[in-house]
Amino acid sequence: MALKKFNPTTPSRRQMTMPTFEEVTTNAPEKSLLVSLKKTGGRNAQGKITVRHHGGGAKRKYRIIDFKRNKDGIPAKVATVEYDPNRSAYIALVVYADGEKRYILAPVGLKVGDTVVSGPEADIKPGNALQLKHMPVGTFVHNIELQAGKGGQMVRSAGTSAQLMAKEGNYATLRLPSGEMRYVRIECKATVGTVSNTTHEIVNIGKAGRKRHMGWRPTVRGSVMNPCDHPHGGGEGRSPIGRPSPVTPWGKPALGYKTRKNKKYSDRFIIKRRNAK
Protein backbone atom coordinates (compact mmCIF):
# COMPACT_ATOMS: atom_id res chain seq x y z
CA MET A 1 0.00 0.00 0.00
CA ALA A 2 2.88 2.32 -0.76
CA LEU A 3 2.94 5.21 -3.22
CA LYS A 4 5.27 5.56 -6.18
CA LYS A 5 6.90 8.92 -6.96
CA PHE A 6 8.40 10.01 -10.27
CA ASN A 7 11.47 11.89 -11.44
CA PRO A 8 10.66 15.60 -11.93
CA THR A 9 10.97 15.57 -15.72
CA THR A 10 8.02 18.03 -15.91
CA PRO A 11 6.28 20.16 -13.27
CA SER A 12 3.34 17.74 -13.20
CA ARG A 13 5.56 14.66 -12.84
CA ARG A 14 7.23 16.34 -9.86
CA GLN A 15 3.92 16.30 -7.93
CA MET A 16 2.40 13.10 -9.30
CA THR A 17 2.03 9.99 -7.15
CA MET A 18 0.56 6.60 -7.96
CA PRO A 19 -0.11 3.36 -6.04
CA THR A 20 2.54 0.68 -6.44
CA PHE A 21 -0.19 -1.97 -6.94
CA GLU A 22 1.93 -4.40 -4.94
CA GLU A 23 -1.21 -6.21 -3.70
CA VAL A 24 -2.49 -6.73 -7.26
CA THR A 25 -1.57 -10.20 -8.53
CA THR A 26 -2.94 -10.17 -12.11
CA ASN A 27 -4.16 -7.79 -14.80
CA ALA A 28 -6.32 -10.35 -16.63
CA PRO A 29 -9.90 -10.23 -15.29
CA GLU A 30 -12.30 -13.19 -15.19
CA LYS A 31 -14.19 -12.91 -18.50
CA SER A 32 -17.37 -14.56 -17.21
CA LEU A 33 -17.78 -11.71 -14.69
CA LEU A 34 -17.34 -8.83 -17.16
CA VAL A 35 -20.10 -6.68 -18.64
CA SER A 36 -19.73 -4.00 -21.32
CA LEU A 37 -20.16 -0.37 -20.26
CA LYS A 38 -21.60 2.23 -22.61
CA LYS A 39 -20.30 5.79 -22.50
CA THR A 40 -22.99 8.35 -21.69
CA GLY A 41 -21.00 11.58 -21.75
CA GLY A 42 -22.99 12.62 -18.69
CA ARG A 43 -26.27 12.60 -20.67
CA ASN A 44 -29.56 10.93 -19.77
CA ALA A 45 -32.01 9.18 -22.12
CA GLN A 46 -33.27 12.57 -23.33
CA GLY A 47 -29.76 13.65 -24.29
CA LYS A 48 -29.66 16.30 -21.56
CA ILE A 49 -26.53 16.81 -19.47
CA THR A 50 -27.24 15.47 -15.98
CA VAL A 51 -23.59 15.29 -14.86
CA ARG A 52 -21.34 18.14 -15.97
CA HIS A 53 -17.70 17.63 -17.03
CA HIS A 54 -18.18 13.97 -18.00
CA GLY A 55 -16.92 12.51 -21.26
CA GLY A 56 -14.11 10.60 -22.88
CA GLY A 57 -11.80 8.48 -20.79
CA ALA A 58 -10.31 5.03 -21.20
CA LYS A 59 -12.60 2.15 -22.13
CA ARG A 60 -13.72 0.02 -19.21
CA LYS A 61 -15.59 -3.20 -18.60
CA TYR A 62 -17.74 -3.51 -15.51
CA ARG A 63 -16.78 -6.23 -13.02
CA ILE A 64 -19.82 -7.90 -11.44
CA ILE A 65 -19.21 -7.68 -7.69
CA ASP A 66 -20.93 -9.91 -5.12
CA PHE A 67 -22.19 -7.40 -2.55
CA LYS A 68 -24.74 -9.86 -1.12
CA ARG A 69 -22.30 -12.58 0.02
CA ASN A 70 -25.23 -15.00 0.19
CA LYS A 71 -23.45 -18.37 -0.32
CA ASP A 72 -23.51 -19.17 3.39
CA GLY A 73 -21.39 -21.98 4.76
CA ILE A 74 -19.48 -22.64 1.51
CA PRO A 75 -15.78 -21.75 1.79
CA ALA A 76 -14.13 -19.85 -1.06
CA LYS A 77 -10.44 -19.57 -1.89
CA VAL A 78 -8.90 -16.29 -3.05
CA ALA A 79 -7.53 -16.84 -6.57
CA THR A 80 -6.41 -13.29 -7.46
CA VAL A 81 -6.42 -9.71 -6.19
CA GLU A 82 -7.16 -7.30 -9.05
CA TYR A 83 -7.41 -3.64 -9.97
CA ASP A 84 -10.93 -2.45 -10.79
CA PRO A 85 -11.21 0.69 -12.98
CA ASN A 86 -14.78 1.28 -11.76
CA ARG A 87 -13.99 1.79 -8.06
CA SER A 88 -11.24 2.95 -5.74
CA ALA A 89 -10.87 -0.39 -3.90
CA TYR A 90 -9.17 -3.52 -5.17
CA ILE A 91 -11.29 -6.61 -5.80
CA ALA A 92 -10.59 -10.29 -5.16
CA LEU A 93 -11.63 -13.22 -7.32
CA VAL A 94 -12.81 -16.05 -5.06
CA VAL A 95 -13.53 -19.62 -6.15
CA TYR A 96 -16.12 -21.46 -4.05
CA ALA A 97 -15.84 -25.13 -3.14
CA ASP A 98 -18.65 -25.91 -5.60
CA GLY A 99 -16.67 -24.26 -8.44
CA GLU A 100 -18.53 -20.93 -8.72
CA LYS A 101 -16.40 -17.80 -9.18
CA ARG A 102 -17.31 -14.39 -7.79
CA TYR A 103 -15.66 -11.03 -7.25
CA ILE A 104 -15.71 -9.48 -3.77
CA LEU A 105 -14.28 -6.25 -2.38
CA ALA A 106 -10.76 -7.03 -1.18
CA PRO A 107 -10.14 -6.02 2.46
CA VAL A 108 -6.73 -5.07 3.85
CA GLY A 109 -4.60 -8.16 4.45
CA LEU A 110 -6.44 -10.53 2.10
CA LYS A 111 -3.94 -12.56 0.05
CA VAL A 112 -4.04 -15.20 -2.65
CA GLY A 113 -4.67 -18.61 -1.08
CA ASP A 114 -6.69 -17.26 1.85
CA THR A 115 -10.12 -18.75 2.54
CA VAL A 116 -13.23 -16.61 3.07
CA VAL A 117 -16.70 -17.72 4.10
CA SER A 118 -20.04 -16.12 4.89
CA GLY A 119 -22.74 -17.15 7.35
CA PRO A 120 -23.32 -17.27 11.11
CA GLU A 121 -20.50 -19.77 11.71
CA ALA A 122 -17.83 -17.59 10.04
CA ASP A 123 -14.79 -16.49 12.06
CA ILE A 124 -14.17 -12.81 12.72
CA LYS A 125 -11.38 -12.32 10.18
CA PRO A 126 -10.98 -10.00 7.16
CA GLY A 127 -13.09 -11.04 4.18
CA ASN A 128 -15.66 -13.09 6.08
CA ALA A 129 -19.27 -11.88 5.92
CA LEU A 130 -21.90 -12.39 8.60
CA GLN A 131 -24.87 -10.70 10.19
CA LEU A 132 -24.18 -7.90 12.65
CA LYS A 133 -25.83 -9.88 15.45
CA HIS A 134 -23.07 -12.51 15.21
CA MET A 135 -20.22 -9.97 15.49
CA PRO A 136 -18.61 -8.80 18.74
CA VAL A 137 -18.85 -5.12 19.65
CA GLY A 138 -15.81 -3.18 18.42
CA THR A 139 -15.45 -5.07 15.13
CA PHE A 140 -14.43 -3.01 12.08
CA VAL A 141 -16.63 -3.78 9.07
CA HIS A 142 -17.34 -2.66 5.51
CA ASN A 143 -19.86 -3.41 2.71
CA ILE A 144 -22.80 -2.99 5.11
CA GLU A 145 -26.39 -3.76 4.15
CA LEU A 146 -29.18 -1.28 4.88
CA GLN A 147 -31.87 -3.89 4.23
CA ALA A 148 -31.25 -7.56 4.99
CA GLY A 149 -30.60 -9.50 1.78
CA LYS A 150 -30.37 -6.46 -0.48
CA GLY A 151 -26.56 -6.41 -0.59
CA GLY A 152 -23.97 -4.07 0.91
CA GLN A 153 -24.54 -0.38 0.21
CA MET A 154 -22.44 1.50 2.77
CA VAL A 155 -18.67 1.73 3.36
CA ARG A 156 -17.32 0.38 0.06
CA SER A 157 -14.67 2.99 -0.84
CA ALA A 158 -10.93 2.39 -0.57
CA GLY A 159 -9.51 2.56 2.94
CA THR A 160 -12.86 2.91 4.72
CA SER A 161 -14.37 0.96 7.61
CA ALA A 162 -17.21 1.36 10.11
CA GLN A 163 -17.07 0.23 13.73
CA LEU A 164 -19.76 -1.76 15.51
CA MET A 165 -20.34 0.28 18.67
CA ALA A 166 -23.33 -1.47 20.33
CA LYS A 167 -26.12 -4.02 19.87
CA GLU A 168 -29.50 -3.43 21.46
CA GLY A 169 -32.80 -5.09 20.59
CA ASN A 170 -33.30 -5.28 16.83
CA TYR A 171 -30.65 -2.69 16.00
CA ALA A 172 -26.88 -2.37 15.94
CA THR A 173 -25.15 0.99 16.33
CA LEU A 174 -22.42 1.75 13.80
CA ARG A 175 -19.93 4.59 13.62
CA LEU A 176 -19.47 5.36 9.93
CA PRO A 177 -16.28 6.78 8.34
CA SER A 178 -17.90 10.23 8.22
CA GLY A 179 -18.36 10.22 12.01
CA GLU A 180 -22.11 9.65 11.74
CA MET A 181 -23.61 7.30 14.34
CA ARG A 182 -26.40 5.22 12.87
CA TYR A 183 -28.77 2.34 13.65
CA VAL A 184 -28.78 -0.63 11.27
CA ARG A 185 -31.02 -3.70 11.57
CA ILE A 186 -29.15 -6.47 13.37
CA GLU A 187 -30.05 -9.02 10.64
CA CYS A 188 -28.09 -7.02 8.03
CA LYS A 189 -24.84 -8.49 6.78
CA ALA A 190 -21.44 -6.82 6.75
CA THR A 191 -17.93 -7.93 5.84
CA VAL A 192 -15.17 -7.94 8.44
CA GLY A 193 -12.16 -5.66 7.93
CA THR A 194 -11.12 -2.42 6.22
CA VAL A 195 -11.43 -1.93 2.47
CA SER A 196 -8.11 -2.26 0.60
CA ASN A 197 -6.01 0.47 -1.09
CA THR A 198 -5.78 2.67 2.01
CA THR A 199 -3.41 5.18 0.35
CA HIS A 200 -6.00 6.13 -2.28
CA GLU A 201 -6.98 9.38 -0.53
CA ILE A 202 -3.42 10.79 -0.61
CA VAL A 203 -2.72 10.07 -4.29
CA ASN A 204 -1.81 13.24 -6.22
CA ILE A 205 -3.33 13.20 -9.72
CA GLY A 206 -0.53 15.52 -10.87
CA LYS A 207 -1.69 16.45 -14.36
CA ALA A 208 -4.83 17.16 -16.37
CA GLY A 209 -4.29 14.27 -18.78
CA ARG A 210 -4.63 11.74 -16.01
CA LYS A 211 -8.00 13.22 -15.10
CA ARG A 212 -9.05 12.96 -18.76
CA HIS A 213 -8.17 9.24 -18.72
CA MET A 214 -10.65 8.92 -15.84
CA GLY A 215 -13.40 10.45 -17.97
CA TRP A 216 -13.44 13.95 -16.43
CA ARG A 217 -13.43 17.04 -18.65
CA PRO A 218 -12.33 20.56 -17.62
CA THR A 219 -14.44 22.65 -15.24
CA VAL A 220 -15.01 26.19 -16.54
CA ARG A 221 -15.40 28.97 -13.95
CA GLY A 222 -18.70 30.82 -13.97
CA SER A 223 -16.95 34.21 -13.83
CA VAL A 224 -15.49 33.71 -17.33
CA MET A 225 -18.86 32.80 -18.88
CA ASN A 226 -21.48 35.07 -20.40
CA PRO A 227 -24.43 36.23 -18.26
CA CYS A 228 -26.76 33.90 -20.18
CA ASP A 229 -24.68 30.90 -19.10
CA HIS A 230 -23.97 31.63 -15.42
CA PRO A 231 -25.07 34.11 -12.72
CA HIS A 232 -21.39 35.06 -12.21
CA GLY A 233 -20.85 35.80 -15.91
CA GLY A 234 -20.51 39.08 -17.78
CA GLY A 235 -18.82 42.37 -16.96
CA GLU A 236 -15.69 43.97 -18.34
CA GLY A 237 -12.49 42.07 -17.62
CA ARG A 238 -12.20 40.35 -14.27
CA SER A 239 -15.39 41.54 -12.65
CA PRO A 240 -16.71 40.62 -9.20
CA ILE A 241 -19.68 38.28 -9.13
CA GLY A 242 -22.00 41.06 -7.95
CA ARG A 243 -23.69 38.95 -5.28
CA PRO A 244 -23.33 38.48 -1.51
CA SER A 245 -22.19 34.86 -1.98
CA PRO A 246 -21.34 32.48 -4.85
CA VAL A 247 -24.11 30.49 -6.52
CA THR A 248 -24.38 27.47 -8.82
CA PRO A 249 -25.21 27.84 -12.54
CA TRP A 250 -28.88 27.49 -11.52
CA GLY A 251 -28.79 30.25 -8.90
CA LYS A 252 -28.71 28.01 -5.82
CA PRO A 253 -26.26 28.86 -3.00
CA ALA A 254 -22.87 27.24 -3.58
CA LEU A 255 -20.31 26.27 -0.91
CA GLY A 256 -22.28 23.98 1.35
CA TYR A 257 -25.97 24.42 0.56
CA LYS A 258 -27.97 21.76 2.42
CA THR A 259 -29.93 19.54 0.05
CA ARG A 260 -31.10 16.79 2.42
CA LYS A 261 -34.87 16.68 3.02
CA ASN A 262 -35.74 17.67 6.58
CA LYS A 263 -38.35 14.90 6.94
CA LYS A 264 -36.48 12.01 5.38
CA TYR A 265 -37.53 8.52 6.48
CA SER A 266 -34.01 7.47 7.50
CA ASP A 267 -33.65 10.37 9.98
CA ARG A 268 -35.00 8.09 12.70
CA PHE A 269 -31.98 5.79 12.28
CA ILE A 270 -29.36 8.54 12.59
CA ILE A 271 -28.25 9.05 16.20
CA LYS A 272 -25.62 11.69 15.49
CA ARG A 273 -25.13 13.56 12.22
CA ARG A 274 -21.70 13.54 10.62
CA ASN A 275 -21.25 17.29 11.14
CA ALA A 276 -22.60 17.43 14.71
CA LYS A 277 -20.31 19.23 17.11
Swiss-Prot record:
One GO BP annotation here? cytoplasmic translation
Keyword Ribonucleoprotein carried by entry: yes
The ranges of region (Disordered) come to: 222-258
The record's Gene3D superfamilies line, in alphabetical order, gives: 2.30.30.30, Nucleic acid-binding proteins (2.40.50.140), Ribosomal protein L2, domain 3 (4.10.950.10)
Q: Name one GO cellular component term.
A: large ribosomal subunit
Q: Which UniProt keywords are present, listed alphabetically?
A: Ribonucleoprotein, Ribosomal protein, RNA-binding, rRNA-binding
What does the UniProt function comment say about this protein?
A: One of the primary rRNA binding proteins. Required for association of the 30S and 50S subunits to form the 70S ribosome, for tRNA binding and peptide bond formation. It has been suggested to have peptidyltransferase activity; this is somewhat controversial. Makes several contacts with the 16S rRNA in the 70S ribosome.
Q: Known HAMAP family for this protein?
A: Ribosomal_uL2_B
* Entry-linked NCBIfam families: rplB_bact (TIGR01171)
Q: What is this protein called?
A: Large ribosomal subunit protein uL2
Taxonomic source organism? Clostridium perfringens (strain 13 / Type A)
